[in-house]
Regions:
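C-terminal membrane-cytosol helix-exit motif in multi-pass small-molecule transporters
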Residues: 5-19, 215-223
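12-transmembrane solute porter fold
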Residues: 22-192, 196-215, 219-222, 226-227
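Intrinsically disordered, low-complexity terminal tails of fungal membrane proteins
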Residues: 225-260
Length: 260
């Protein structure tokens, strides 16, 4: 399945780049300032988030032997903190640069992974599990809101919908990739450490911590909201729809060679 997926993905890129007259995802969009770095940061952050959620639940149910009902109660903070995090992210947007809001979202998932990875096998819920769950509530909303703003400001009018949709899709890809890679880490550690289930879970969580740290570093170094010096809203459709913000060029001017 992995090989088939890679082949299909490669075929999609070839079609979009060489044959599609009106491509769904113009490859030139990835040449817009900060856009490619943003994509990687978002994917890795959602990977780390999914790892923290999956293995927190795994820890509670398999190590501490919680029932499904107890686990549901343990995750009840999401009902309160989740909506609050959306409001807080919206409040921060006009006051703090989007890349720093994203950094906050990455930072909380770093802490959440560490808190769960370092828990004793048996411990009161309030000591580490509760703060890890509360902190992780902020991550997806902060990252999603900030990424949508940065993506929309990185491309021109015509491709803002495409860029925004891609950010939403990365949530699903990140979750799947995160759990997949972390599961591999967990199984390999258990295999070579005498079947130690808890050690495997800790290793998976530290893997989530590591990729979140990389995402945070990339956010600090390369993710910015591109500056747009245009005044007003240009009326000429060919310019408005093709301009890639921050490059000073139209989309057709930065397309791949075969499209020039």
């Amino acid at each position: 399945m992995l090989i088939a997926s890679l082949v299909l993905f490669g075929a999609f890129l070839v079609w979009e780049g060489k044959y599609a007259k009106d491509p769904v995802m113009p490859l030139a969009v990835f040449k817009a300032p900060t856009f490619s770095a943003l994509i990687l940061v978002v994917v890795m952050t959602y990977m780390a988030f999914s790892i923290s959620q999956w293995y927190t639940i795994t820890w509670l149910q398999q190590v501490r032997h919680w029932s499904v009902t107890q686990t549901m109660a343990g995750y009840s903070p999401f009902l309160v903190v989740g909506p609050l995090s959306v409001g807080l992210a919206a409040w921060l947007l006009p006051r703090v640069a989007a890349q720093w809001i994203m950094a906050m979202g990455i930072g909380v998932v770093i802490v959440a992974n560490v808190l769960v990875a370092t828990m004793p096998e048996q411990q009161t819920y309030w000591a580490q599990a509760f703060p890890a769950i509360v902190l992780s509530c902020f991550s997806p909303d902060f990252v999603y809101v900030a990424a949508q703003l940065i993506a929309s400001n990185s491309v021109g009018r015509r491709y803002q919908g495409v860029a925004g949709s891609l950010i939403g899709t990365l949530n699903l890809y990140g979750n799947s990739l995160g759990i997949g890679f972390a599961g591999t880490v967990e199984s390999q550690v258990q295999k070579y450490k005498g079947g130690d289930h808890v050690l495997g879970i800790r290793a998976a969580l530290f893997f989530g911590f590591a990729i979140a740290v990389v995402a945070l570093g990339m956010d600090f170094l390369w993710v910015r909201v591109p500056k747009d010096n245009r005044e007003g809203w240009e009326s000429r459709e060919d310019q408005v729809e093709s301009l890639v913000v921050g490059t000073g060029h139209r989309l057709d001017e930065i397309e791949l060679p075969h499209r020039r």
